Amino acid sequence: MTAILPSTAATVNTGFLHFDCVGKTFPTPRGPYVAIEDVNLSVQQGEFICVIGHSGCGKSTLLNLVSGFSQPTSGGVYLDGQPIQEPGPDRMVVFQNYSLLPWKSARDNIALAVKAARPHLSTSEQRQVVDHHLELVGLTEAQHKRPDQLSGGMKQRVAIARALSIRPEVLILDEPFGALDAITKEELQEELLNIWEEARPTVLMITHDIDEALFLADRVVMMTNGPAATIGEVLEIPFDRPREREAVVEDPRYAQLRTEALDFLYRRFAHDDD
């Protein structure tokens, strides 16, 4: 039987990244809007977490709280025991829209981040870091091209390399492959896992794609609908690492997990039509 845990099962205080009774309310002309409430989750160091749910379920709110772009109305978000109060280089975000400087080459986009976040390195060491991360994402030959000369998949490779080059403790991925075609998407998912296996940052990834979540994650956090969204269930993903897509998809547990996620999202927490 696949392990499905209620959100309270993840509320131990030993997590590297910890959400403690987190709520977030936004003021609106119609009165306060409760985006999320009573969110409890502990993420271990080096763990890969995917968060899925319908639009408006608070996924982006969680991302902004971990990033430090926003503060909770109630409760707290903690990294290594310290409250997250502002953005910092220990947490890097990769967005769906690439967020690259258009006038700089792929190499210079990465180099700028390394120089800003790791000034203690010598020029030679910084250059080696950039070279290494360009090689990791397969862009050594395209390193001098600007973003407008790169495909969508290549742009996202640059964004991932830039984020990882500064050695963040937490990598935050906001639907990074959502705008890509199916083939490129699968290629980048596999590349992401290979890169993650090397550096092992803690990953919090927002996605709408159940198959993507099941392939990548150690646990899949499923959100209830908003307003007042919270964690409904947490799927434990049992597949061994390193993972091969064919082996994962052919595992009988994969179909069971997928069915359970679909049941949660499209039957128990389906959006009303009216």
Curated annotation (Swiss-Prot):
It holds the Pfam family ABC_tran. It is found in: Cell inner membrane. GO terms for cellular component: plasma membrane. It comes from the Bacteria. GO terms for molecular function: ABC-type nitrate transporter activity; ATP binding; ATP hydrolysis activity. ATP binds at G53, H54, S55, G56, C57, G58, K59, S60. The keyword ATP-binding applies. Disruption phenotype: Mutant requires high concentration of nitrate for growth. It grows normally with nitrite or ammonium as the nitrogen source. One of its GO terms (biological process) is nitrate assimilation. SMART domains: AAA. Its main location: membrane. Keywords: ATP-binding, Cell inner membrane, Cell membrane, Ion transport, Membrane, Nitrate assimilation, Nucleotide-binding, Translocase, Transport. The keyword Nucleotide-binding applies. It is a peripheral membrane protein. Its EC number is 7.3.2.4. It catalyses: nitrate(out) + ATP + H2O = nitrate(in) + ADP + phosphate + H(+). The complex is composed of two ATP-binding proteins (NrtC and NrtD), two transmembrane proteins (NrtB) and a solute-binding protein (NrtA). Part of the ABC transporter complex NrtABCD involved in nitrate uptake. The complex is probably also involved in nitrite transport. Probably responsible for energy coupling to the transport system. Belongs to the ABC transporter superfamily. Nitrate/nitrite/cyanate uptake transporter (NitT) (TC 3.A.1.16) family. This is Nitrate import ATP-binding protein NrtD. It comes from Synechococcus elongatus (strain ATCC 33912 / PCC 7942 / FACHB-805) (Anacystis nidulans R2). The gene is nrtD.
